[in-house]
């Protein structure tokens, strides 16, 4: 890790304030009490595909430790080719196995995971965090998923993961066979490592059947014409994020995400006397939003979670309108108590609740920040009328801009 000048790090030939650069939100997860309903909600209603599961119960010291606590499996889910972009674990089992989880039951988010640009960046981050006294939960390589990573805590004990190189699920829909989990690492790896391609080549030489991994079968028939493709629901998730958090101290949380993880402040809002902060990792208006805990009750949201909302971007405005009807028809609870002032950079959005009461923010458009680093002036933003959903919209200058979805929708 070479440095040049005052506290600058050479990241691929560019001098940065951190020895890594976050490119995007890679995945995110909840700890749920209502596991059966949660799996159905996220897979059948929202369209996440289960790419793998693992048995959390294997960590128990005795069968009695987790007896009667429900589904032992953790579910790894995807909307595209990344092995997982969303993860569900059983909250009661995690608390039974982990004293820290028992001590902080309001931390129902199990991970906030950010993609960096290379394995070297992960390795340099691990070293730098250690030098700065940033508490590291663990480092290594996960299986399932194959992502090289390190986990650190923010000022509210949310677990943030930095990773590189997550497994890709290809055209046949099969995840990596479990026999290939021998490349799991439980500590920071020595660099360089062999490539993913060479791992597959070795598996073929060893006679591994590459199609023996998990393959998801959708529980609903593909009856909706979604812009020319038949899908089981009338919309398609094409991106995850932003992550919106309730925090004890907005200033302290902002300092961690800015100074330690390298996020950039895009905008701040004062709402009913409370400061709210919107930060970005790339060109999107915000990939992270920070709100004071005092707003939970004012917004009618769960008082026992630090998750304000988890964002899901749909492919277009028409699909967002279709999603509102589809989810309402299938019994999803919707709230209109989250005012537009608290999600600048997004125009039309709907907020729905999962079976545990976590708020999900569905939207289709995210304002993009250009070369000068300035967001769109407030007076030039679209101003939706509450409760009105026009049949069609005039475009903004950055409509359909930002991170694209790669590959087929289904």
What are these regions (language model features)?
Residues 2-9, 23, 32-37, 57, ...:
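Vicinal oxygen chelate
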Residues 51, 160-161, 266, 360-361:
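Generic structural signal for well-ordered beta-strand positions
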Residues 20, 30-86, 90, 234, ...:
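Core segments of cupin and vicinal oxygen chelate
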Residues 18-22, 103-107, 233-237, 301-305:
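Short, flexible turn/loop "capping" segments at secondary-structure junctions
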Residues 88-90, 97, 105-111:
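A broadly used, surface-exposed interaction patch
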Residues 2-8, 171-233, 371-410:
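Acidic/histidine-enriched, glycine/proline-rich intrinsically disordered or flexible terminal extensions
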Residues 85-89, 96, 124, 286-290, ...:
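Intrinsic, low-complexity N-terminal interaction/targeting segments
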Residues 14-17, 96-102, 229-232, 294-300:
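Short beta-strand/turn micro-motifs at beta-sheet edges
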């Amino acid at each position: 890790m070479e440095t040049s000048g005052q506290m600058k790090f050479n990241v691929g030939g560019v001098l940065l304030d951190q020895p890594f650069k976050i490119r995007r939100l890679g995945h995110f997860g909840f700890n749920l009490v209502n596991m059966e309903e949660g799996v159905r909600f996220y897979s059948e209603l929202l369209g996440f595909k289960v790419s793998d599961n693992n048995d959390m119960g294997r960590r128990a010291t005795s069968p009695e430790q987790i007896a009667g606590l429900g589904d032992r499996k953790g579910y790894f889910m995807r909307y595209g080719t990344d092995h997982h972009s969303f993860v569900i674990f059983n909250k009661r089992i995690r608390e039974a196995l982990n004293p820290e989880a028992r001590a902080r039951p309001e931390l129902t988010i199990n991970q906030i995971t950010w993609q960096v640009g290379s394995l070297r960046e992960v390795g340099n981050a691990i070293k730098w965090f250690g030098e700065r006294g940033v508490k590291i939960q663990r480092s290594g390589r996960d299986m399932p998923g194959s992502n090289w990573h390190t986990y650190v805590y923010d000022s509210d004990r949310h677990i943030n993961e930095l990773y590189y190189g997550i497994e890709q699920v290809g055209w046949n829909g099969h995840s990596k066979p479990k026999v290939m989990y021998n490349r799991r690492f439980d500590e920071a790896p020595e660099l360089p490592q062999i490539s993913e391609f060479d791992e597959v080549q070795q598996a073929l030489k060893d006679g591994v059947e590459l199609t023996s991994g998990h393959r998801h079968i959708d529980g609903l028939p593909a009856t909706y014409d979604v812009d020319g493709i038949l899908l089981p629901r009338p919309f398609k998730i094409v991106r995850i994020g932003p992550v919106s958090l309730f925090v004890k101290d907005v200033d302290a949380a902002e300092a961690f995400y800015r100074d330690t993880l390298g996020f950039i402040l895009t905008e701040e809002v004062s709402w009913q006397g409370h400061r709210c902060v919107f930060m970005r990792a790339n060109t999107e208006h915000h990939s992270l939003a920070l709100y004071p805990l005092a707003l939970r009750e004012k917004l009618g949201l769960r008082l026992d979670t630090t998750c304000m909302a988890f964002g899901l971007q749909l492919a277009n405005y028409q699909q967002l309108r279709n999603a509102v009807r589809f989810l309402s028809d299938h019994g999803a609870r919707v709230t209109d108590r989250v005012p537009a002032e608290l999600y600048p950079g997004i125009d039309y959005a709907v907020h729905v609740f999962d079976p545990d009461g976590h708020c999900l923010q569905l939207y289709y458009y995210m304002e993009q920040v250009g070369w000068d680093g300035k967001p769109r002036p407030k007076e030039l933003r679209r101003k939706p009328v509450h409760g009105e959903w026009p049949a069609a919209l005039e475009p903004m200058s950055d409509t359909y801009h930002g991170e694209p979805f790669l590959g087929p929708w289904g």
